[in-house]
Amino acid sequence: MQRFLLTLLWLALWCNAQSQVSFGKAERFNDDWLFHLGDEPKASQPKFDDAQWRHLDVPHDWSIEGQLSKDLASCTGYLPAGIGWYRKHFVLSAQDIASLPLSYIYFEGIYNRSEVYLNGHLLGKRPNGYVSFLYDMTPYLRKGDNVLAVRVDHSRIADSRWYTGSGIYRDVWLVRAPKVHLAQWGTTYRLKQMNEDGSADIEVDVAVDFSAAGKKSTKKQAAMMLNVTLRDAEGRKVAAKACEARELQTLTLHVPDAKRWDLKHPYLYKLTVELSAGNTIDTIDSIETIHSIDQATINVGLRTLQFDPDHGFALNGKWMKVKGVCLHHDAGVLGAAVPREVWVRRVKELKRMGANAIRMSHNPQAPVLYDLCDSLGMLVMDEGSDEWEFPKRKWVEGWNQGTPAYDGSYDFFEEWIDRDVADMVRRDRNHPCIFLWSVGNEVDYPNDPYSHPVLDGGNAAINQPMFGGYKPDAPHAERIGKIAKRIAAVIRSIDTSRPVTGALAGVVMSNETEYPEAIDVVGYNYTENRYDIDHEKYPRRIIYGSETGVGYDAWKAVRDKEHIFGQFVWTGTDYLGESGRWPSRGLNTGLLDFGNFKKPRGWFRAALWSEEPVTYIGANPITSPRNNNRGDGRRRGNFVSAEAQDDWNLPVFPNRQGQASADSVIMRVVCYTNAPQARLLLNGSLVGEMKPQNDTIGIIHWDIPYAPGTLRAEGCDLQGNVLSAYEIKTHGEATALRLTELLPEDCEEVHQILVEVVDKDGNRVKSSQADIACDITGPAVLLGLEGSNNTDMSDYRDNHQPAYRGRLVAYVRRTGTGPVSVRFSAADIQAASMAF
């Protein structure tokens, strides 16, 4: 019975760590690190005096803790970087080492150019800040005290076109294992076929690492078995097989009544591989008789992918449109160290909007994000890099402003690209959400750095700036095709179950190279005008919008063309870096803002994408007759906006004549809806007649005189029945704060608290910029207050923050057991508290 309990405990550990580590006993190694910002040449040595270093837990991003400055680079969000050291003291007893003699350290991500030492010995270097990697600590491990030291060199501050963060910004794992164990990332599966009777056959590859067994490895192989078991979502065994353990074994499992993974019902099986000794195949069903040596558990999703140049993309045999968004890896005030709970809320908000895919822009991201996409039903385009052998421009004085810098990752490309790409594919290949591997983003951007004579051809049909014509001194674009072939070959050597793609910025230039032919599916960035031209010119090419704007026309180019299977909108959320001139935290192109609140453009996108009824209204002043005539016959606001905020208070027109009176203001009310028609009511009375959907611009609008009260839009079917509605109200003066915990059911450690400034009737005061302070008692810490204002350059780590549009979100991490009270206050407003 004791052995049975131990086996269950082992399984529980694996369920927690399965997507990060695929062997041994893994435990998070995040607590009790020491940190020093600055270089210390002797900090790798175990006896180095670190008594004055800062105590912290990882994940940790030191850049987000720094002071924003207009003297720093705009591309990385006007935030500092530098060199930092981490040290961790830990103890392993003789019993620990005897029971599991091998010890490894696994980092999910360190930005960047890391060096890892154990007891003064270099374990390895990894320059890429986005890949996950494992080091064997066994040769240098000591009984008793040990010191792990990590040097992080982010001294090249402007080394990216967006904010990267600095430090050990993802989870760390300590892995202890027997001398013979399952190989890291060595258990994988692939769907062999779906059968007509509803069953499925899957092939499972299992790699075993015998390297530490030395000369005894052959004998040990003969004495060991692999037991492979597939269980359904309810834990019932549906397939099992056993075989002798070898360095690599392939088994086929037959799955009756196979349930498919899809976007609405992302069904996941669990595959458990157990390496055991002293048993036979006949004892597989008797867990108490198995002497388990190692075990791994992975999620399994059964789905088919089909791509066609004329029909687009089919998931499980059903042709569909990919409604994707591009995502960078930060979360505003939290920087790059993003808690799981924040990712959960972000992905759920995007899915609620109608998005069904995420492009990992432009690098492998945190493993937890792929897990969420598996469980929530989101397709993923996994991307390797943004830069190859030569640097791209990095704007330091504002996006596309001034003189660029040229730091980057190019200097380690040649040495590391094969391994970096291979590690991305090996780490992520078991995720059913992944349907595309990308070799890179915009590596063919004209003259940044590659050039080609075709750029002298006048209208090259490239929508982005070319910075002049052909530059003979620049690297020739023919190199792109050769490198793409190399990277694609690495991917295909590991996984052939998904196609290889790339995101092309200069399609016309790349068409003169081998690049499009080196990949299976060709992504077009902002080049919708080439969809039909190239479909006719290259009839075997599979085309989609790998990066597009949020405009209606870009979506119609996908919706109305069968051969274009989807788009990835830039971007799903606002992100730090790639900033404009100061003040600008980042690029606010998101459908969601920094705090993961849906923006007007997000509502517009929901009206285009969602299968659920959607209606939204926003308003802009067209004119005040006294002071807003431009003198040329046009009136301010005489356009239809996809960015209209949901405000219904008297607009302010600052000018020498003062504010216009309510009866002199004409408001343009815009409605985003997926209903066939909509009408507008003010205080219960019809003020906007029923209007049909406008397929030219995708927006319905009315011009009405402003009057306070409740404005309501109703999206209706053709019979006039209300399908969905949206109301906005005139708010009064701020009187109180209102608190709401967001997604409490998904909270493990980090609580997300919505703080709203409200009037006496509970309406959010959207004009409020009240400075809100947060004070905590009990075992918890404030990670940050996110107001989502892109021009607010105040300290990210203060305990107070101005509200933006009358709200902010607070991130509070529990650090221990016991009651926690979080109090929010602002001048002349009633405070509020929340306990948990």
Label each PLM-derived region with a short phrase.
Residues 152, 275, 715, 757, ...:
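Conserved structural position at the C-terminal beta-strand
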Residues 131-133, 246-255, 693-700, 792-809:
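Aromatic sugar-binding surface patches on proteins
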Residues 46-49, 219-227, 264-270, 666-668, ...:
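Short flexible loop/turn segments that cap and initiate beta-strands
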Residues 21-40, 52-93, 108, 145-214, ...:
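Non-catalytic, glycine-rich low-complexity segments
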Residues 141-145, 205-308, 701-709, 717, ...:
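Extended acidic/polar, glycine-enriched regions
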Residues 25-45, 57-58, 432-438, 444-523, ...:
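Substrate-binding clefts and catalytic carboxylate motifs of secreted carbohydrate-active enzymes
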Residues 60-92, 98-119, 124-127, 179-188, ...:
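Active-site-adjacent substrate/metal-binding segments within catalytic domains
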Residues 27-29, 37-39, 76, 81-185, ...:
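Accessory beta-strand-rich segments of carbohydrate-active enzymes
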